[in-house]
Amino acid sequence: MDKIWRELGLTDEEYEKIISILGREPNITEIGMYSVMWSEHCAYKNSKPLLKYLPTKGERVIQGPGENAGVLDIGDNLAVVMKIESHNHPSAIEPYQGAATGVGGIIRDIFTMGARPIALLDSLRFGIPDDKRTKYLIENVVAGIADYGNCIGIPTVGGDTYFEESYKGNPLVNAMCVGIVEKDKIKKGIAKGIGNPVMIVGATTGRDGIGGASFASQELSEESEEKRPSVQVGDPFMEKLLLEACLELFETDAVVAIQDMGAAGLTSSSCEMASRGGVGMEIDLDKVPLREKGMTPYEIMLSESQERMLVVVEKGKEEDVQKVFKKWGLNAATIGKITDDGMIRVIKEGKIVAEVPAKSLAEDAPQYIREEEVPKWQEDVNKLNINEVKPPEDMNKALKDVISSLNVASKEWIYSQYDYMVRTDTAITPGMDAAVVRIKGTKKAIALTTDCNGRYCYLDPYIGSQIAVAEAARNLCMVGAKPIGVTDCLNFGNPEKKEIYWQLKNSIFGIAKACETLQIPVVSGNVSLYNENEEGAIYPTPVIGMAGLIEDVSKICTMDFKKERDVIIILGENKGEIGGSEYLKVCFGMVKGQPPQIDLEEEKRLQELVLKLIEEGLINSSHDISEGGFAAALVESAISGKKGAKISLQTSLREDVELFSESPPRALITVSPEKVEEVLKIAYEYQVPAQKVGVVEGKKIAIEVNGKKIIDLPLEVLEESWRGRIKWEMERN
């Protein structure tokens, strides 16, 4: 066993700590159990000391971080359950299964809480699709998500996708799931009741995914290709049966505690449940239903075979459980019992093959506060002299270039592969500011979004992360939803590098600041580190998943222009910032400058104003101004509503900056002519600048600045550029 712990990702110091916990040298199975439970993926050992700065309390919070998912009270004895998780490393190696099992895993996190999943979202990051490998990754990640979600019958209603060079070879696949549960039916993973039986339910256990959690805690390299067995294989039809069987089981009083088997499989589910409950657990591996012959204790304990759950059952109710699972054609086997000594004791063929304290696996992983320093290149990339950027001679071309850029263009090629209408509750479909899903039997709806501009976070992780939170909240407000909770997925490079740790720390502080100011608690989340390729780390990408509550679904608002002659109004102020903008990258090939600065109090006022205007029925459309600036937002609203616009701007800014600056917080709204004065009056009361800039009319976009016509383009030409870009990229050789 020469230094085998190193191969499994443990340091020599960590190995010494294990010896002192056990009072002896661990055997191979025990080393394996510690290696997965103490991996970054399971233990958050580089991020936990920072995560405590996030605000996790709020009047709606029923369950914050620490369980399988977060839970928020939405009234009427109902709660929304939400969680986002990454499946980045598996998707880089085996994109179809990596993405599919990412979806499967996050769905299990939701129904293990007792909730019925109602929606999926996906936040995706890819390299530029100009080579075969990148296209292969994109095609297969999207197909993996689509097939799993479509087969299990849960609508994929939204998400976000960005393409940047930094994600080449290390795509980000962050899957978010949301469910609804009656408040008194929430289930938790807290084992209790000495002598209560422990059952494994669902699929059989095979060799797939062994050591996947430790694999997800390393940088990708050439050798990663050899780790394909670390990627699990998903079966959405099996998961559909498991979902229905579990929800039916929850209607009985047989379940004491339940946990899905995700990363680290039987090891994590057993030690986490036992540790939360302050108890021990004895497991007999001869009773685990296996799908392969000759599996060792190490393999059974570390298998990440999908579609399995571990259940602690009330003593004497085992048959009730078996009856339910038999009906759905699934396994339910009693494999152990709860003990009072706090140990995870694993038995095979009558012999003890592993015996370790549950708490030491689940809670005692070392935590690291790393050294940090500002990256050497940071000062250089933050320099931007606007005078070096010559305004384009042809503004029509500049507009077409910006709206057909990969990050602004329509993502229809992606979301058209998803069934977003299954379950028939989707009220706002993908492609809008936020998705909206009705809650059956009520007037309520939940609005959902994921947001993060990694480029902003690369230029300034503190400000960029605040913008991610602010934009997610603004997107929800645009459809008439009040933001109620965040689930975040922090995607970064190797935290052992000082500049990466600096990015991670500043990003978390930025999220904390924005969530505190906007009063939105973080209820769940995930950290994915070591996201690097040969060139270095990905852009820091703290993806913000957010849910908002709509009390009356009949009052939702969308971004499409509704009526000719409606007046177009910009809310908020253009501060003339173009650092980190899509315009700067697309038209000049530059990723430079400071990201736009954000005043969170200003943001709060704008969001409250938009919610008020929607609630009062005073506006016909609303759309947030972000990537691509005012010009892109205008084109998107026009294309969505199949109506043009005539715009006249008065400004002291340069024409291109007026059109393409991404200064937050801003929104584009349309108002019936007779309601304009009232809207302007209310905006004044909320201290939000509001400027009439034009009207909805015709079939083209015509813009003049300070009396000079600078843009005049038919809507169909713009639509072709905007709608066709990604499809064209994916189909060209």
Curated annotation (Swiss-Prot):
For this UniProt entry, the molecular function terms from Gene Ontology, in alphabetical order, are: ATP binding; magnesium ion binding; phosphoribosylformylglycinamidine synthase activity
Say which enzyme class the record assigns. Answer: ligase
Location in the cell reads: Cytoplasm
Q: Where does Mg(2+) 1 bind?
A: E85, N526
Residues where substrate binds? S86, H87, N88, H89, R108, Q232, E304, S305, Q306, S528
Q: Name one Pfam family in it.
A: AIRS
* Domain of life from the UniProt record: Bacteria
| Active site (catalytic residues) | H41, H87 (proton acceptor)
| UniProt-listed GO biological process terms | 'de novo' IMP biosynthetic process
Which reaction equation describes what this protein catalyses?
N(2)-formyl-N(1)-(5-phospho-beta-D-ribosyl)glycinamide + L-glutamine + ATP + H2O = 2-formamido-N(1)-(5-O-phospho-beta-D-ribosyl)acetamidine + L-glutamate + ADP + phosphate + H(+)
Keyword set, alphabetical order = ATP-binding, Cytoplasm, Ligase, Magnesium, Metal-binding, Nucleotide-binding, Purine biosynthesis
Q: In which pathway does it act?
A: Purine metabolism; IMP biosynthesis via de novo pathway; 5-amino-1-(5-phospho-D-ribosyl)imidazole from N(2)-formyl-N(1)-(5-phospho-D-ribosyl)glycinamide: step 1/2
What's the EC number here?
6.3.5.3
- Pull one GO CC term from this UniProt entry: cytoplasm
Annotated spans, Disordered? 212-232
User: Which parts of the sequence bind ATP?
Assistant: Y44, K83, D488, G525
Gene3D superfamilies linked to this entry: PurM-like C-terminal domain, PurM-like, N-terminal domain
Locate the residues binding Mg(2+) 2.
Answer: D109, D260
Q: Which InterPro entries match?
A: PRibForGlyAmidine_synth_PurL, PurL_linker, PurM-like_C_dom, PurM-like_C_sf, PurM-like_N, PurM-like_N_sf
**Family the entry assigns:** Belongs to the FGAMS family.
The UniProt function text for this chain reads:
Part of the phosphoribosylformylglycinamidine synthase complex involved in the purines biosynthetic pathway. Catalyzes the ATP-dependent conversion of formylglycinamide ribonucleotide (FGAR) and glutamine to yield formylglycinamidine ribonucleotide (FGAM) and glutamate. The FGAM synthase complex is composed of three subunits. PurQ produces an ammonia molecule by converting glutamine to glutamate. PurL transfers the ammonia molecule to FGAR to form FGAM in an ATP-dependent manner.
Subunit comment for this entry?
Answer: Monomer. Part of the FGAM synthase complex composed of 1 PurL, 1 PurQ and 2 PurS subunits.
The record's listing under NCBIfam families reads: FGAM_synth_II, PRK01213.1
Q: What is this protein called?
A: Phosphoribosylformylglycinamidine synthase subunit PurL
**Gene name?**
purL
